[in-house]
Amino acid sequence: MAVTVVDPLVEQPDYLPPPPKVVTTPCDPWPRPYFLEDGLRRVKPYHFTYNTNVKQRWRGREILDIFTDEFRDRPKEYYKDAIESGKIQVNGQPFASVTSQVKNGDVISHTLHRHEPPVTGQPIGIVHEDDDLIVINKPAGVPVHPAGRYNYNSVVEIMRAERGHQWNPLPVNRLDRLTSGVMFIGKHKKAAEKLTDQLVGRTVRKEYVARVRGEFPEGDVICEEPILQISPKLGLNRVRASGKSAKTVFKRLAYYLPKLSESGEPQGAGYSIVRCLPLTGRTHQLRVHLQFLGHPITNDPIYANRRVFGANLGKATVDSDDDEDVMTRLSRMGKTEVADAVAYEDEMVEQYNKKKAEKMTGELCDICQTPLYSDPGPHELGIYLHAKKYADADGRWSYETSLPEWALPPKGYEGPTEATPESDPLAIDIAKLQLDDEKPSNEQQAGASDGQQQAATAS
């Protein structure tokens, strides 16, 4: 069954009073200011204070440069005014000027009128629930934890809003914001730790399904290329000899021919539906391995983007000669820009730039004068990657979802409506592979308590 989406909550006042001069803790409005409109879950803007310790890369830098470079969702003029008006402070005190430098041990506070991006209004589906765990079907485009511009529009906060303020969900595995599918939520620490041990111990089999460019080869395709994190800030990972060991088994489920133009010429290369079985859990493992094989996920905003990787989309690239150029292009356009994987051909660049400009509505917020964005399109709400099934290696439990709509046969075509039960390449003792999974990052531990660890995923 699916969790019922809450009705629009209590109306918020049209006017929100300004925050006090010094705010040291984030506000916590309850009930959460959600409302549903045009198929999207929206959050009414609210005042909020971010508090963060100075990062190593910030030390000795001017405060205006830090905010302009690190937080690109607002223009430089906004941050200049926020510093001068005391909305951005250091250790509870206003900065002397926009050129003030920060040092180790400083705590930076930023009080702002927060505008969260809308996410899909699709409810969080419940695959299974008992006294210990909730197994959910995470919608694409919804982050697991509050991060970046997302706070209440996150899995943790949406479920808390539906189940009560005191309820503390403990995510065990983590999916990327753009990825959908099976996720485990612990109801208490012991249950979360038990499943975490299984994930870290590699006794859980994971099955994903992806929609990729072109005609993927038939048969089992095994990719064992190591993966290196090139830029944590940009979320960029690539195949590199100096990276961490990684292994994925792929199996094509279907190939669909491209549409024909009026002249009868094929448009594009068609696409394949691919079963993905990660044997390790590197960040972006499936996305990076599929790119390396020359079949990136069709709408992947990073790894299927010709504006970033060029004509060959990073196929079979193992050297670092173009890393700096790739990072520059990705940073310049923003990894979540409208182009995503659309601007494949040179003639589409102009169209992309037009769409990019249309992201801004031209309107300003009445309270904070922040430029307002238009609603995200379908291509910004997720990618064609879905965690379909998680199963205990010893057969004690198994949870799976149906295929997402984008993986079903298009009209007029025949193809699988469910994943086919081929011989399973994972029918081995996974723990004996001696491939070290990544340890959970700080972000992955954000929803845990008392040192609980979360297992990294391969998405």
Mark where each language-model region is:
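Pseudouridine synthases involved in rRNA/tRNA modification
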Residues: 1-77, 81, 236, 241-247, ...
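Short, well-ordered loop/turn sites that connect or cap secondary structure elements
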Residues: 82-83, 102, 278
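Internal amphipathic helical hairpin motif
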Residues: 151-167, 232-234
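Short beta-strand segments enriched for Tyr within beta-sheet-rich domains
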Residues: 195, 282-290
